Design a protein with these regions (language model features):
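Short, low-complexity N-terminal intrinsically disordered segments enriched in polar/charged residues
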Residues: 1-22, 26, 30
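A beta-strand edge to alpha-helix "cap/lid" segment located at domain peripheries
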Residues: 56-136
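Alpha-helical elements of Rossmann-like donor-binding domains used by nucleotide-donor carbohydrate transfer enzymes
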Residues: 11, 46-49, 103
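A solvent-exposed, acidic/Ser-Thr-rich amphipathic alpha-helical stretch
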Residues: 21-84
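Residues at structural and domain junctions
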Residues: 9-10, 33, 55, 94
């Protein structure tokens, strides 16, 4: 596991959870491609617009876990990043939590003195939607 690539994945999680979508350019190429079940986003502006949909949730919490991959001779890191993405929302006057177990297929490159996502493919392992008891 590369600390730099794991750090990039953690920065993605923090930017998404904090809704700092205007900073996504610091971790993604302008030509970023993000795909998942039923969607494709082919540029950074498309990703920024697509991530606006997360504002429907009261909060999100992305827990980044395992990361396995390697740098290729072409200067591209290819690997997999595990994540549990929790989404808190209201349903019928109660709080609910939608959890998604994700295995991102990532391609990362060096760009402007740092690392940037070139692509992310979101593969779902499972989804769970349950009532939530909030901590006090």
């Amino acid at each position: 596991m590369s600390n730099d690539t794991l750090d990039l994945a953690c920065r993605y999680a923090a930017l998404i959870d904090d809704r700092r979508l205007d900073e996504l350019h610091t971790i993604m190429l302008p030509s970023i491609r993000i795909t998942g079940p039923g969607y494709v986003m082919d540029t950074l502006p498309e990703v920024e617009r697509g991530m606006e949909l997360l504002r429907q949730y009261e909060r999100t919490f992305h827990m980044v876990g395992n990361q396995l991959g390697a740098w290729g001779g072409d200067g591209v890191w290819s690997g997999e990043t595990y994540c549990i993405a929790s989404h808190v929302y209201q349903r019928d006057g109660a709080k609910w939590k939608l959890d998604m177990a994700i295995r991102y297929q990532d391609r990362i490159v060096r760009h402007d003195g740092g690392l940037r996502f070139a692509s992310r493919e979101l593969r779902l392992a499972w989804v769970q939607d349950l009532p939530l008891t909030m901590a006090r």
